[in-house]
Amino acid sequence: MSAKIIRIATRQSPLALWQANHVREMLVKQWPNLSIELLPMITSGDRFLKDKLLSAGGKGLFVKELEEALLDKRADLAVHSTKDMPAQLPDGLSLAAICKRDNPFDALISPQFKSLDALPKNAIIGTSSLRRQSQLLAYNPNLQVKTLRGNIHTRLSKLESGEYQAIILAAAGLERMGLAHHITQLIPDDIMLPTCAQGALCIECRTDDLEIQELIYGLNDPISALCVHTERRVNAKLGGNCHIPFAVYCTITAENLLLLRAKVLNLDGSQMIDDEQQGKIEEAEIIADRCTESLMTKGAMTLLSTIPS
């Protein structure tokens, strides 16, 4: 490996910086003589934190500037929460590594109520996710969902101020930031199925940069990568992004089979189309396509067409 300085592009949020430093530490552990610098950046998504993701332009806004830094070679790699990645990457860029997946589930946080079932009628729940909103209302239509934006600490502060009676956040982010003590309940996946790739960090680099790909090869977790890419395949075929209430989650069973579950909902959770597929690990792409085709046959695209663009 050459002696050049490796530059990691990252957002400037506390969670993003933690994630970039985590990757840096793993790289230095494997390559002790490596020199690594972080390149913190403010993304378009960070500038729109007070707006709904839907109106601001979607999750791709959180990676656009980082990808531009890769393409113009200001950075050698970028660290992302894989759930923030659009289904399609720009030409010339690849997801070269999926790190071992952390907690994929959603967490309820409430200073007053100990579970979703304990929430009173008309309780105000904060989230910026249409997926969470739809599944919450499908489970309990008597809840009120209110948009919640900002980084983790901002969202927790809004909860503490009394603006919400509970909020929903990704458990992985809370755990990475040492804030797991705030978690009131890990929401079971039969109530709230995770979003595509939730809990997994990814490393993006230039497709033709074989040196960087060799460098990060050891950070790729094969099982996590298999599950994440299977989820992303379904997501891509459905045109998935944060504009639609769509959930997909892939796991490996005790019998070493691939289990894939997905669901599409309307905004108020009154309509839901779901599917479950299982099969051999080596047939992951076939299973993903079978799941997609089943959802479409059941009317997923018709249901999604009712979601405002």
Curated annotation (Swiss-Prot):
Keyword presence, Transferase: yes
E.C. number: 2.5.1.61
A GO CC term assigned to this protein in UniProt: cytoplasm
Cofactors (names): dipyrromethane
Residues with PTM S-(dipyrrolylmethanemethyl)cysteine: C242
GO biological-process terms attached to the record: protoporphyrinogen IX biosynthetic process
Cofactor detail note: Binds 1 dipyrromethane group covalently.
GO MF terms held by the record: hydroxymethylbilane synthase activity
Keywords: Porphyrin biosynthesis, Transferase
InterPro entries for the chain: HemC, Porphobilin_deaminase_cofac_BS, Porphobilin_deaminase_N, Porphobilinogen_deaminase_C, Porphobilinogen_deaminase_C_sf
Listed pathway(s): Porphyrin-containing compound metabolism; protoporphyrin-IX biosynthesis; coproporphyrinogen-III from 5-aminolevulinate: step 2/4
HAMAP family, sorted: Porphobil_deam (MF_00260)
Anything else known: The porphobilinogen subunits are added to the dipyrromethane group.
Chain's role: Tetrapolymerization of the monopyrrole PBG into the hydroxymethylbilane pre-uroporphyrinogen in several discrete steps.
Entry's family note: Belongs to the HMBS family.
Protein name: Porphobilinogen deaminase
Annotated organism of origin: Legionella pneumophila (strain Lens)
